[in-house]
């Protein structure tokens, strides 16, 4: 729990891997940021209040607990469901209305034979804000490349559709290109998220 002026911030971490959970606790202690750590499967029902922001870096693969995936909108009718689809749904379910999700996902997430189900969920439940491809130099190959997907949970009379910000984040070693990207992002923010 952290107090920022008149707001209290709670940090929660959900990690199924016990080693990564312990590393996260040590990192939080080092940074002096208090975290509640839940060493559990993030696709199972969560014991948390709705959040203003969810940040996630999702594993790619199949989720083996078919009983749980069948309870979810992004679960497949047959066979194992994609864990990254289920984690997107879980992230949105964990948000308050108008809350934001910042999710690291495979860059090719909007391709494949099951993508219509994901697209329907995103358009029904959220306002997509941005899809930012991370620099290719961060990954061994194009197949491993990831992107940042930014979604806002819909809330009647609060959220509104925006022009989705699509961009390739330039290599961090090129300051001029990176500054150009930041300028573009700021312009998009000014146009689509003006303070009232």
Language-model region placement:
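Conserved Class I SAM-dependent methyltransferase catalytic core
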Residues: 80-138
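Flexible, glycine-/basic-rich loop-and-beta segments that form/coincide
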Residues: 143-196
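Mobile active-site "lid"/loop adjacent to the S-adenosyl-L-methionine
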Residues: 57-87, 108
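Conserved S-adenosyl-L-methionine
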Residues: 1-56, 61, 107
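Domain-level detector for long C-terminal conserved domains
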Residues: 75-80, 94, 121, 152-156, ...
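Conserved nucleotide-binding/hydrolysis micro-motifs of P-loop NTPases
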Residues: 59-62, 108-110, 138, 155-156, ...
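General small-molecule cofactor/ligand-binding pocket signal
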Residues: 36-40, 132, 167
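Local beta-strand N-terminus motif with an aromatic residue
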Residues: 50-52, 128, 146
């Amino acid at each position: 729990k952290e107090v920022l002026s008149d707001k209290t911030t709670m940090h929660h971490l959900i990690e199924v891997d016990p080693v990564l959970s312990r590393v996260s606790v040590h990192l939080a202690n080092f940074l002096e940021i208090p975290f509640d750590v839940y060493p559990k499967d993030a696709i199972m029902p969560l014991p948390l209040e709705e959040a203003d922001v969810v940040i996630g870096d999702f594993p790619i693969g199949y989720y083996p607990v078919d009983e749980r995936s069948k309870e979810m909108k992004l679960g497949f009718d047959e066979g194992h469901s994609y864990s990254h689809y289920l984690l997107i749904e879980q992230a949105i379910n964990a948000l308050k209305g108008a809350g934001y999700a910042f999710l690291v996902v495979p860059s090719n997430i909007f391709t494949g034979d099951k993508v219509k189900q994901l697209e329907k969920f995103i358009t029904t439940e959220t306002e997509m804000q941005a899809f930012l491809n991370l620099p290719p130099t961060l990954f061994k190959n194009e197949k491993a490349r990831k992107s940042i997907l930014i979604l806002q949970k819909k809330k009647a009379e609060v959220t509104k559709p925006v022009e989705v910000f699509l961009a390739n984040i330039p290599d961090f070693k090129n300051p001029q290109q990176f500054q150009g990207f930041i300028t573009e992002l700021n312009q998009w923010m000014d146009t689509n998220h003006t303070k009232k």
